[in-house]
Amino acid sequence: MNKKALLLIAALLVAVTATAQTSSRWGVTLGANFNEVHFKQTDILPSEKMFGPQAGVTGEMNFGSSGFGVDGALLYTLKQGKVNYGDRVAWKSLGYGEETVAMHYIDVPLHLKFKYRRLGGAETTIMPLVFVGPQFSFLPYASHKSLNSYPPVNVYLDMGAGVELFERMQVRAGYNFSVGQSFHTKLLDDNVAKNRTWYLTLPWFLK
């Protein structure tokens, strides 16, 4: 799926929201991610997965009693990966070894969501949900800019599942991956890296 397709999905989500009978609410969210910096040429630069935090504000709109809705968020996310530049003479000769590449993102995910509400009354206690949609990630700061070149905006495909508890708190597990490059190395500029990220978040809605 390319960037144009994800932009089209985002536009459709906005259009549906504008025309549907909806109820909305807002809240805050906290979470953590486990990120892999995946290189196109994996034999050149080995990497290790790393944890990072994420936090921000979130909102959702539900379309009546259908179970369908949309949600979005504004998040700070730190995505990291440990890259062993010292495995190659080109970087080792410059004094680099095992380096932690840190990317500080402002994320804007937009999801189409479905909650299964027909649980005979139990849905007020626990309600399963699934979601999918694009995520737009803006990069105000990244480490090791002498080694890597970073695009200012990344587009991801984001998906996941979870449960809503007591109509207030959600527990979500998800996965997203970069559609384009997250960065490429300057010495070998065809060595493209993409973020592949598992995450767990805990949104808490204020009403």
Feature-to-residue mapping (PLM):
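Residues on the lipid-exposed face of transmembrane beta-strands in outer-membrane beta-barrel proteins
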Residues: 28-32, 53-61, 74-76, 108-116, ...
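Outer-membrane beta-barrel translocator domains and adjoining extracellular loop/strand segments
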Residues: 38-44, 82-89, 142-148, 183-189
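Short loop/turn motifs that connect adjacent beta-strands in outer-membrane beta-barrel proteins
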Residues: 20-24, 64-68, 117-127
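Structural signature of outer-membrane beta-barrel domains
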Residues: 33-37, 77-83, 137-141, 176-180, ...
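Repeated loop/turn-to-beta-strand initiation elements of outer-membrane beta-barrel proteins
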Residues: 66-70, 120, 167-173
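Residues that define the transmembrane beta-barrel architecture of outer-membrane proteins
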Residues: 22-26, 47-53, 102-108, 126, ...
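Outer-membrane beta-barrel "beta-signal"
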Residues: 192-207
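Bacterial Sec-dependent N-terminal signal peptides
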Residues: 1-29, 202, 206
